[in-house]
UniProtKB/Swiss-Prot annotation:
<dbReference type="InterPro" id="IPR049315">
    <property type="entry name" value="GDC-P_N"/>
</dbReference>
<dbReference type="InterPro" id="IPR003437">
    <property type="entry name" value="GcvP"/>
</dbReference>
<dbReference type="Pfam" id="PF02347">
    <property type="entry name" value="GDC-P"/>
</dbReference>
<keyword id="KW-0560">Oxidoreductase</keyword>
<dbReference type="InterPro" id="IPR015424">
    <property type="entry name" value="PyrdxlP-dep_Trfase"/>
</dbReference>
<dbReference type="GO" id="GO:0019464">
    <property type="term" value="P:glycine decarboxylation via glycine cleavage system"/>
</dbReference>
<comment type="similarity">
    <text>Belongs to the GcvP family.</text>
</comment>
<comment type="subunit">
    <text>The glycine cleavage system is composed of four proteins: P, T, L and H.</text>
</comment>
<dbReference type="GO" id="GO:0004375">
    <property type="term" value="F:glycine dehydrogenase (decarboxylating) activity"/>
</dbReference>
<dbReference type="GO" id="GO:0005829">
    <property type="term" value="C:cytosol"/>
</dbReference>
<dbReference type="InterPro" id="IPR049316">
    <property type="entry name" value="GDC-P_C"/>
</dbReference>
<comment type="function">
    <text>The glycine cleavage system catalyzes the degradation of glycine. The P protein binds the alpha-amino group of glycine through its pyridoxal phosphate cofactor; CO(2) is released and the remaining methylamine moiety is then transferred to the lipoamide cofactor of the H protein.</text>
</comment>
<dbReference type="InterPro" id="IPR015421">
    <property type="entry name" value="PyrdxlP-dep_Trfase_major"/>
</dbReference>
<feature type="modified residue" description="N6-(pyridoxal phosphate)lysine">
    <location>
        <position position="709"/>
    </location>
</feature>
<protein>
    <recommendedName>
        <fullName>Glycine dehydrogenase (decarboxylating)</fullName>
        <ecNumber>1.4.4.2</ecNumber>
    </recommendedName>
</protein>
<dbReference type="GO" id="GO:0016594">
    <property type="term" value="F:glycine binding"/>
</dbReference>
<dbReference type="GO" id="GO:0005960">
    <property type="term" value="C:glycine cleavage complex"/>
</dbReference>
Length: 962
């Protein structure tokens, strides 16, 4: 029997071996092929010595899955999840188990990427289209987006849209009603300051007294009052004011729509449609506008088009509005949104249907009526005379009520002026109303819920004015009226899932996206009620588990990045960019350098960089790159000197977006610092740094970290994400604060960038588990394996395709770019043809035409085995052989497997297929690997131009179901 130590038998590194794709034998074979003796040798060949860390990270040793779960269970148990009546945009909800199990906890849904390849994403595109339909039906407006990050940032986007489209061009004031949620006002003020807008806050009726470009109202307001805005909106619109409304999605089931009152834009959180509170997120925001504003909408929009066979197909519409194309001229910097959560909300609406939603909303409203009736019967004064779910009370002994509430393990809303608020939700039971009477009135009140209910039924409810009761039908489309049994719902979800290619089927080698394993053990705690059901504004002494987890994660991220502090709040990478630039902006202002507003950005940068700079009120100056893809130092020196007096910062990605470690990175930092600027190092490629180097060690001042890339949070088909920022100590006082929750940091006074103080805190356990389980050595080995995999793929493919950029020793970093332009010239085969043909081989295409047009950028993460890498390489080699047949004339340019890709079942069943110059087998079974595990695209290549020219962003017409 083999002699093994107890340490070996304990297998503390088992998770590491399961996270990393290639086993030891595969790693050695790959090292032999690329010409390196070991991972350390390969690292030395690739990473410039001047930036290599001399010490290991201080994270600790790796641990086993059971040990990690036990530790985080201990953290979860420290959270005291009281019954929450705080409201303020966050509510208890019952996640249907059929959605929890089959969507939220299903890698077929949470590991997919944003649907840039729509032919292999028709399932989630349909679910998102359903979300848009729900949004349009409930708001009464024409066109909805595919989700934004949260309600508060959606408000900021609404303000920006209002300025873009308002005909009141000379106006610079945005009015905000004084009864909106405070976190919404906080985020709006932060954004307005960057844009140079003046924000005026006051009673809604006073909006008519100002020269405005836009105005924001809450429906229902933070105190629960329901207001008929019809006349006010008409008056404002007559003055060319763009009217925006923050609305409660559940209330809209019963209430007159804001669109019918005359609103231009309506937005809000979809959280209470079956998405847990999660201590603040992640949640999807809906955003809906009049059709005339469609070109100014922020974020992604799903539209209906047709495929090559003329069949209905879905795709992302009007992408020319977005940051990856328009850069600093984009409507928004939004990239990752909240697609997984939007899909959950849409499935919630599908599962309950219009009748089920009305029952839920009516039950919530009835409980509010009963609570109000009982309190008023005892002489309690209410602030609001109308309500849907929220009662605000004045004149109480606040200290006594709070003491009784805490004793009963419930949280109420306590305002600074002594008002006490109670917001009811889907989870409220009649026993909860009894308990609320006890807490608010004290014992011996004698109130009976059943008697109060009978009284309301007999007399009728007046809490929703008759003029504000919804009269029009909602969700009449068949999709929302046929899946109310769990069997049908389960099959509908599965049917959509089967149309999509996600990581549970094959490698997704998207460059700059880091589609690594999202291990099941990392995902488990997210569903635990101790993490899922915590309100973000709960007293912090009830959230000790969360606060300890956040502190530990922040400490680890500080160590990994080489910075001095971390701010967790930004809930996407793009928001992290914005937050980091704001910190730089405020730092300059604190030194009397408010004029420093120029941001240098290399021409190869990701589109979010210039879009975020514009969002932060900066002027973008583009610097050149040389033929090797590196920053042109001469041009940088010239530009930095020219703008030295106004230089704010540079935004640079490392390793570069060209997939190499630039040797001159420290010199770049020095040049910018010498001219008074700060260095923002984009963390998109952090997966090539962890344990080997760090932004702080390199010389940067601030970075965002994509937790949904480097630190294992799944992409969710387009979100959720997290973009915390790391900063040097001089920037720490200038990171985001929050108006509601103030944990006692020096940045507490700053404005917020997200609705919740800790952003999408509900998914932080994923990154915590990832780091905890891997430990210092595991994190480093993951990075080294990512380098190995990329260089293995690069060297294999270089025999068939030109590789565009390489670094020292002819190596790449964690990704490589193959140049398809020579092939296109010689054969007429485009990068699009190759991308779609990969679908036939069972692969999602690599990143297409970024950062260079006519290329594919490939990032095989550390989680992919040599077997999977070889399967991808074989597919690319086979495709090269197919291109050769087009080059030789054997196959026509306009009739070959690449031009006609992807192929569907309908194609091979078509008798006319025999007229093609290639066989059915070549079309759909181009390799032996495909025969054993075939992924079938459900539509042919989609016509993008038709979709934008014939814009339709709602569910299919009823005729499609006849």
């Amino acid at each position: 029997m083999t002699k093994q130590t107890l340490t070996q038998l304990e297998q503390h590194d088992l998770f590491l071996r399961r996270h990393i794709g290639p086993d030891s034998n595969q790693q050695q074979a790959m090292l032999n092929f690329v010409g390196a003796e070991s991972l350390e040798d390969l690292t030395a060949q690739i990473v410039p010595e001047s930036i290599r860390l001399s010490q290991d990270l201080s994270i600790g040793d790796s641990c086993g899955e059971a040990e990690g779960i036990a530790y985080i269970r201990g953290l979860a148990d420290q959270n005291q999840v009281f019954k929450s009546y705080i409201g303020m945009g966050y509510y208890g909800t019952q996640v249907p188990n059929v959605i929890l199990r089959n969507v939220f906890e299903n890698p077929g849904w949470y590991t997919a990427y944003t649907p840039y390849q729509p032919e292999i994403a028709q399932g989630r595109l349909e679910a998102i289209l359903n979300f848009q339909q729900v949004s349009m039906d409930l708001t009464g407006l024409d066109l909805a987006s595919a989700s934004l990050l949260d309600e508060a940032t959606a408000a900021a986007e609404a303000m920006a849209l209002a300025k873009r489209v308002s005909k009141a061009k000379k106006a610079n004031i945005f009015f905000v009603a004084d009864d909106v949620f405070p976190q919404t006002l906080d985020v709006v003020k932060t954004r307005a300051e960057c844009f140079g807008f003046e924000v005026v806050v006051g009673p809604a009726s006073e909006a008519v007294n100002y020269e405005l470009f836009g105005a924001l109202f809450q429906y229902t307001n933070r105190f629960g009052q329901i207001t008929d805005f019809t006349e006010l909106f008409a008056t404002l619109r007559a003055k060319n004011v763009i009217v925006t409304v923050a609305a409660d999605i559940m209330s809209l089931v019963l209430l007159k729509s804001p669109g019918s009152m005359g609103a231009d834009v309506v937005f809000g959180s979809a959280q209470r449609f079956g998405v847990p509170m999660g201590f603040g997120g992640p949640h999807a925001a809906f955003f809906v506008a009049r059709d005339e504003h469609k070109r100014s909408m922020p974020g992604r929009i799903i539209g209906v088009s047709k495929d090559a066979r003329g069949n209905r197909a879905l795709r992302m519409a009007m992408q020319t509005r977005e940051q990856h194309i328009r850069r600093e001229k984009a409507n928004s910097n939004i990239c990752t949104a909240q697609i997984l959560l939007a899909n959950m909300a849409s499935f919630y609406a599908v599962f309950h249907g219009p009748d089920g939603l009305k029952t839920i909303a009516s039950r919530i409203h009835r409980f509010a009526d009963i609570l109000a009736a009982g309190l008023q019967a005892k002489g309690v004064s209410l602030v609001n005379s109308t309500w849907f779910d929220t009662i605000s009370i004045k004149g109480l002994d606040v200290a006594a009520v709070n003491a009784r509430a805490l004793a009963a393990e419930m949280n109420l809303r306590f305002d600074a002026d002594g008002t006490v608020g109670v917001s009811l939700d889907e989870t409220t039971l009649r026993t909860d109303i009894d308990a609320l009477f006890d807490v608010i009135l004290g014992a011996g009140h004698g109130l009976d819920v059943a008697a109060l209910d009978a009284q309301i039924v007999g007399q009728g409810s007046q809490s929703i004015p008759a003029a504000l009761v919804r009269q029009d039908a909602i969700l009449s489309h068949p999709t929302f009226n046929r899946y109310q049994s769990e069997t049908e719902m389960m099959r509908y979800i599965k049917r959509l899932e089967s149309k999509d290619l996600a990581l549970n089927y094959s490698m997704i080698s998207l460059g700059s996206c880091t589609m690594k394993l999202n291990a099941a053990v990392e995902m488990l705690p997210v569903s635990w009620p101790e993490f899922a059901n915590m309100h973000p504004f709960s007293p912090l002494d009830q959230a000790k588990g969360y606060t300890q987890l956040i502190e530990e994660l922040s400490t680890w991220l500080v160590n990994i990045t080489g910075y001095d502090a971390v701010c967790i709040q930004p809930n996407s990478g793009a928001q992290g960019e914005y937050a980091g630039l704001l910190a730089i902006k405020k730092y300059h202002e604190s030194r009397g350098d408010a004029h420093r507003n120029i941001c240098l950005i290399p021409q190869s940068a990701h589109g979010t960089n210039p879009a975020s700079a514009q969002l932060a009120g900066m002027q973008v100056v583009v610097t050149a790159c040389d033929k090797q893809g590196n920053v042109d130092l001469d041009d940088l020196k010239t530009k930095a000197a020219e703008v030295a007096g106004n230089l704010s910062c540079i935004m640079i990605t490392y390793p570069s977006t060209h997939g190499v470690y630039e040797e001159s990175i420290r010199e770049i930092c020095d040049i910018v610092h010498q001219h008074g600027g700060q260095v923002y190092l984009d963390g998109a490629n952090m997966n090539a740094q962890v344990g080997l180097t760090s932004p702080g060690f390199i010389g940067a001042d601030v970075s965002h970290l994509n937790l949904h890339k480097t630190f294992a949070i799944p992409h969710g088909g387009g979100g959720p994400g997290m973009g915390p920022i790391g900063v040097k100590s001089h920037l720490a006082p200038f990171v985001a604060g929050h108006v509601v929750v103030k944990p006692g940091r020096e940045s507490d006074h700053n404005g917020a960038v997200s609705a919740a103080p800790y952003g999408s805190a509900g998914i932080l356990p994923i990154s915590w588990m990832y780091i905890k389980l891997l430990g210092s050595q595991g994190l480093k080995k993951s990075t080294q394996t990512a380098l190995l995999n990329a260089n293995y793929v690069m060297k294999k493919l270089s025999e068939h395709y030109p590789v565009l950029f390489r670094g020292r020793n002819d190596r790449v970093a964690h990704e490589c770019i193959i140049d398809l332009r020579p092939l296109k010239e010689a054969s007429g085969v485009t990068e699009m043809d190759i991308a779609k043909r990969l679908n036939d081989y069972g692969f999602h295409a690599p990143t297409m035409s970024f950062p260079v047009a006519g290329t594919l950028m490939i990032e095989p993460t550390e989680s992919e085995s040599k077997v999977e890498l070889d399967r991808f390489i074989d597919a690319m080699v086979s495709i090269r052989a197919e291109i050769a047949k087009v080059e030789s004339g054997e196959w026509p340019v306009d009739n070959n497997p690449l031009h006609n890709a992807p192929h569907t079942m309908a194609d091979i069943m078509d008798p006319e297929f025999d007229t093609r110059p290639y066989s059915r087998e070549v079309a759909v079974f181009p390799s032996a690997a495909v025969r054993t595990n075939k992924f079938w695209p459900t539509v042919n290549r989609i016509d993008d131009v038709y979709g934008d020219r014939n814009l339709m962003c709602s569910c299919a017409p009823l005729s499609d179901y006849e």
